[in-house]
Structures are given as structure tokens and as C-alpha cells.
Regions:
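Ribonuclease/tRNase effector modules and their secretory precursors
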Residues: 1-104
């Protein structure tokens, strides 16, 4: 059985498409998240949340620590490509200290 993480990584090896929202969020001066960091999260990170019923299509939230900092990436695997919906640096006010669970 193919997992969503397998589908994400297979799609990423085919082609990666950064949606406009992702590009805008990655370019914010306080974030400056590179495409290399996003690709590191996609290829080596872990799934934190799975959104099978997302209106944009099945998507998920991944986390990794490229360059020693936590990065969250929301992406959606498609047959022809991996859509990067957004990428951001998680905020301790909204996430647990390990950045893996949302705060209450």
C-alpha cells in the first residue's frame, strides 16, 4: 500500500510546482526559506498532519530541520508534480516546543 509520504516523494522526484502563496511566504524577510530547504523537508521530513479531504486535493503538513531550523511545508501530490502550497517557520506560540503538535 502506498502511503501519502511515498506519493509526496514520488511526485517531488518528477516535478515540483511552487504555488504563488508558497513563493510569497518563503520570500518574507523574517523567513527567507529556500527551495533547497523545502526540498529537504519533502525528501527527508516527517508528516505531522494529513488532509485527505482538502478541497485542493489530498495534502499534508511536513516538518524537517534543514539548516538546523524547523520548517513546515504543506504540499499536495499530483500525478504529474508535487504542489507546494505553503512553507513557513513554525511559531512557538502556536506549536509545541518540538514543533510537531499544535498548541491548545
Amino acid at each position: 500500500m502506498t502511503t501519502v509520504l511515498d506519493r509526496v516523494r514520488t511526485a517531488a522526484r518528477t516535478r515540483v510546482l511552487y504555488l504563488p502563496h508558497a513563493v510569497k511566504q518563503m520570500a518574507l524577510p523574517e523567513r527567507l526559506i529556500s527551495a533547497a530547504e523545502v526540498e529537504d523537508v519533502v525528501l527527508h521530513g516527517e508528516i505531522l498532519e494529513d488532509y485527505p479531504e482538502d478541497v485542493r486535493g489530498h495534502s499534508c503538513l511536513l516538518m524537517g530541520t534543514p539548516r538546523g531550523r524547523p520548517v513546515h511545508v504543506v504540499c499536495s501530490p499530483r500525478a504529474e508534480y508535487l504542489a507546494i502550497i505553503t512553507a513557513y517557520l513554525p511559531d512557538l506560540a502556536k506549536w509545541s516546543p518540538d514543533f510537531r503538535r499544535r498548541s491548545d
